[in-house]
């Protein structure tokens, strides 16, 4: 795996929030990790809005996300990319995969699949259903896909046994995360993906899609999720409090500690820009805990 140097300006990272709610502390930890990993090597940091699911989108969330990032000093490079404006690109790839026989129409309902624990049993694989009103699934090989995560270490998954053929376009016509994220990362030239460990088990599916479409494989760094006492991650569905501009400095320092970084108590009096300037020069991804969760109660 290529190593990163302090002058690796070829680095392109990204943060890709979903506008289904406001940013919260867990979002901040993910954004900060990806921002620091890019800026520490003089790389670029892109912002992409993963707005492919309009029914889940919260009014005003897009603007609120942009404003919050700016107020916390997490400035991005270039224009914001909106996945809702990329449907033609997604459609072209779905058509190609379907026409090549690499994907097929699936009419299975959620109720039919409930007892299979998320592993698709292949009911429609050879049924030859028409595409209209059906989901589109990608055929997966009976192979193990593995990669070395920069924090979590070696990870592997047998796609056939542990996932099964997976959806790339839903029956309502909306495009699946797995397809959109792979196409957009390749289109934007992303070299490094820093995100939460809840997406660790998604990565082998993305590696397969990258291989199928002839894309380069980026480096991956999956950070521990901040979880509540009941084990659920901080998130919009659990009404985690939104980030407030007036708390930017203490929350940035807390996020740094969640990432295993040293913080100077004197920085409590600093501006967000000053905190980030120091953190950028002291960024040590190897200090991030090799675990998938960190209880919020453990953070100072």
Curated annotation (Swiss-Prot):
The keyword Transcription does not apply. Gene3D superfamilies: Glutamyl-tRNA Synthetase, Domain 3, HUPs. One of its GO terms (molecular function) is glutamate-tRNA ligase activity. L-glutamate binds at residues 14-18, 50, 177, 195. GO terms for cellular component: cytosol. ATP binds at residue 236. A motif ('HIGH' region) lies at residues 17-27. InterPro entries: Glu-Q_tRNA(Asp)_Synthase (IPR022380), Glu/Gln-tRNA-synth (IPR000924), Glu/Gln-tRNA-synth_Ib_cat-dom (IPR020058), GluQ/Sye (IPR049940), Rossmann-like_a/b/a_fold (IPR014729). Its EC number is 6.1.1.-. Zn(2+) binds at residues 106, 108, 120, 124. A motif ('KMSKS' region) lies at residues 233-237. Keywords: Aminoacyl-tRNA synthetase, ATP-binding, Ligase, Metal-binding, Nucleotide-binding, Zinc. Belongs to the class-I aminoacyl-tRNA synthetase family. GluQ subfamily. Catalyzes the tRNA-independent activation of glutamate in presence of ATP and the subsequent transfer of glutamate onto a tRNA(Asp). Glutamate is transferred on the 2-amino-5-(4,5-dihydroxy-2-cyclopenten-1-yl) moiety of the queuosine in the wobble position of the QUC anticodon. This is Glutamyl-Q tRNA(Asp) synthetase. It comes from Pseudomonas putida (strain ATCC 700007 / DSM 6899 / JCM 31910 / BCRC 17059 / LMG 24140 / F1). The lineage of its organism: Bacteria, Pseudomonadati, Pseudomonadota, Gammaproteobacteria, Pseudomonadales.
